[in-house]
Amino acid sequence: MNEKDLKALVEQLVGQMVGELDTNVVSETVKKATEVVVDNNACIDDITEVDIRKQLLVKNPKDAEAYLDMKAKTPARLGIGRAGTRYKTETVLRFRADHAAAQDAVFSYVDEEFIKENNMFAVETLCKDKDEYLTRPDLGRKFSPETINNIKSKFGTNQKVLILVGDGLSSAAIEANLKDCVPAIKQGLKMYGIDSSEILFVKHCRVGAMDHLGEELGCEVICMLVGERPGLVTAESMSAYIAYKPYIGMAEAKRTVISNIHKGGTTAVEAGAHIAELIKTMLDKKASGIDLK
């Protein structure tokens, strides 16, 4: 028996053991299994939209109700579970997505259309770009003489209240909160009989920029709304720094601060009403910061 006959015999025996297979059926099955299905209307869920306060990834928790009750009180990453000794894929992806959002908030700019829509007069500090803004904080507190003159011609001097918006370290915070916060401030001031001018927008802005403006313009109260350094909890946190007659070299303790203005903290509308009340108090007591106590 030669090799060819041996091969034929083996094929015959195998065929008898497993049954003859229809090659056409096999081909069709393989084709269906490997066929690519494309759904043009489908999309991947945005992982950052998941409320981690309501998400429990621990497998078979002893007391899930108590765990969720604890998570509801903090945005901390609790109950994220493990795959062996490692984080789960969903946990890692959410961490990276939140980190990316924080980076984007720092390195992006407030949209020019947004500035126009909110009727803000835009200027910028001495910083030329974002890199210089991050590495030279001192330049983010100063304005050129030309810029100061432009501001004076637009807003005048010796104003009672100046509302200032600075991009700070989070452009996302400004775009997310300003439309609700500013109207609440203006409405509150109007109730107290206090006039507020147009809004000044400052690009590459540090908190100390209000000191330079206070000294040059002679405003009684300056309220600065500025994007705060983003973190993994949120990239949309805004703060309000308010000072009575700010000047260059003013101690930080003389500023009154309302922080964590975002949808997961103090809401923009609530913060706006509180800011208006604080401005009224500062004008009455002619003080701010710890001097207001």
UniProtKB/Swiss-Prot annotation:
Binding site for adenosylcob(III)alamin: V207, E228
This protein's pathway: Amine and polyamine degradation; ethanolamine degradation
Reaction catalysed by this enzyme: ethanolamine = acetaldehyde + NH4(+)
Main location: other
Presence of keyword Lyase: yes
Its EC number(s): 4.3.1.7
Gene3D superfamilies (alphabetical): Ethanolamine ammonia-lyase light chain (EutC), Ethanolamine ammonia-lyase light chain (EutC), N-terminal domain
Cofactor: adenosylcob(III)alamin
Cytoplasm found in the keyword field: no
Family named by the database record: Belongs to the EutC family.
Name by which UniProt lists this protein: Ethanolamine ammonia-lyase small subunit
Native species: Clostridioides difficile (strain 630)
